[in-house]
């Protein structure tokens, strides 16, 4: 039986982190978690990490698409925070962001890790950005590292 399974060390991986500035007090913690994970677990050097800042979550897919089209990166981590309010705006922003990032991954055959918080309350977002529910930025980085390795293995075996 042949099992393809990624590990999380990716010393030579070139990673772009596309991050929204909206809700920056939360998103900066996600960025810290992602970078810490890339460096500590993935052994990725500072020189191989590029951070791209955009206004909000809606802009993440376009920036990710441009990064992917450059052909210079092994993967992309998207970070942001969308918190439900009193209007349907939340569903539109969260849904389009998710769909757009998934489309980039499929169109460019490149791992795009979804580290965008989509929560009902600010308290839930705070919990997921480095307090009692962990750091979803770090989790997105772990997922990306594993997928970079899985895709490299598939390329070698297929």
Curated annotation (Swiss-Prot):
The keyword Transferase applies. It catalyses: (2S)-2-hydroxy-3-oxobutyl phosphate + 5-amino-6-(D-ribitylamino)uracil = 6,7-dimethyl-8-(1-D-ribityl)lumazine + phosphate + 2 H2O + H(+). InterPro entries: LS (IPR034964), LS/RS (IPR002180), LS/RS_sf (IPR036467). GO terms for biological process: riboflavin biosynthetic process. It is an enzyme of class 2 (transferase). Keywords: Riboflavin biosynthesis, Transferase. Pathway: Cofactor biosynthesis; riboflavin biosynthesis; riboflavin from 2-hydroxy-3-oxobutyl phosphate and 5-amino-6-(D-ribitylamino)uracil: step 1/2. Catalyzes the formation of 6,7-dimethyl-8-ribityllumazine by condensation of 5-amino-6-(D-ribitylamino)uracil with 3,4-dihydroxy-2-butanone 4-phosphate. This is the penultimate step in the biosynthesis of riboflavin. Transmembrane segments: none annotated. The active site is at residue 89. 5-amino-6-(D-ribitylamino)uracil binds at residues 22, 57-59, 81-83, 114. It comes from Shewanella frigidimarina (strain NCIMB 400). GO terms for cellular component: cytosol; riboflavin synthase complex. GO terms for molecular function: 6,7-dimethyl-8-ribityllumazine synthase activity. Its EC number is 2.5.1.78. Forms an icosahedral capsid composed of 60 subunits, arranged as a dodecamer of pentamers. It comes from the Bacteria. Signal peptide: none annotated. This is 6,7-dimethyl-8-ribityllumazine synthase.
